[in-house]
Regions:
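Cytochrome P450
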Residues: 1-276
Length: 276
């Protein structure tokens, strides 16, 4: 029997604290060196750090990201009893069993081809230029809120083919996807976070239905026409794939961009090299 009291990190790990937000490196280094696998009771979860440990966990067939496989998990709801957010998570790549995960990945792979990504590179560059034009030339501005929190979601919206005037609806969907799985939210906070998910899913389903009627050479049309062993993606599966892209590519990209700027400002020699 493992004594989890000796493996807990609650006494020093608080990802919401100002100290951690200002400089997470010392805490992360302590986790990696002293607590590579440890219990974090605040999340009712185990934390795994270090590339090898993480890789070993991901490859270990005894472990799964499917919460419903846990022996103490409550009975899974029937689809008709799920709310919009629960239906979205029901098909999310992050929580599927191995066989379904591989099936969806194989079907989705053509939509991420180099040809389509090259098309998107042009759109992404245009989005960034337009954003800087909107900001203008102030003496100072907040990169995190003005760029990092906006561009990644807009880039994914552009990838999916969301009309520019519908970006706010898609942004609310992205916010719900990222915030809705946060284990530290209260039920009230979670309900507020996912409030925009139904409208966002309605928008996606309308767009998917339109693309089914009038396909073109783009990301969403490629998802629709993808076929493997006679199977195609359903609307819910496509919505879940887009949700997975949002979960993996909006919040994380925003954090990465902010840390990149922080690192450059902390290393003037590297910033000078970049300016060359």
């Amino acid at each position: 029997m493992i004594n989890t009291d000796e493996l807990t990190v609650d006494h020093f790990f608080d990802p919401s604290s100002k100290n951690f937000i200002d400089d997470p490196k010392p805490t992360i280094e302590k986790l990696v060196k002293e607590y590579p696998i440890a219990r974090f009771n605040a999340w009712s979860a185990w934390l795994v750090t270090g590339n090898k440990n993480i890789t070993d966990c991901l490859l270990d067939r005894r472990l799964s990201t499917d919460f419903n496989l846990w022996e103490h998990a409550p009975p899974k709801k029937e689809l008709e009893d799920m709310d919009a957010f629960e239906k979205l998570m029901n098909n999310n790549l992050f929580f599927l069993n191995r066989s379904n995960h591989l099936r969806l990945r194989k079907l989705a792979l053509p939509a991420f081809s180099p040809r389509i990504m090259e098309q998107m590179k042009v759109r992404f560059t245009k989005l960034v230029k337009e954003r800087f034009d909107e900001i203008g030339k102030p003496e100072r501005f907040n990169f995190a809120t003005e760029i990092a929190e906006i561009i990644p979601t807009q880039a994914i919206a552009s990838l999916v083919g969301i009309p520019r005037d519908k970006f706010p609806i898609f942004d609310s969907l992205a916010y719900g996807v990222v915030r809705g799985i946060n284990p530290m939210l209260t039920p009230e906070e979670r309900a507020d976070a996912i409030a925009g998910v139904p409208a966002g899913l309605d928008l996606l389903n309308e767009l998917i239905d339109e693309k089914r009627k009038n396909p073109s050479d783009d990301f969403l049309s490629t998802l629709i026409t993808a076929e493997e062993d006679g199977e195609k993606l359903s609307n819910w599966e496509m919505c879940a794939l887009i949700g997975a892209v949002l979960g993996a590519g909006s919040d994380t990209a925003g954090d990465w961009q902010s840390y990149l700027i922080r690192a450059l400002l902390s290393h003037p020699d590297q910033l000078a090299e970049l300016k060359k």
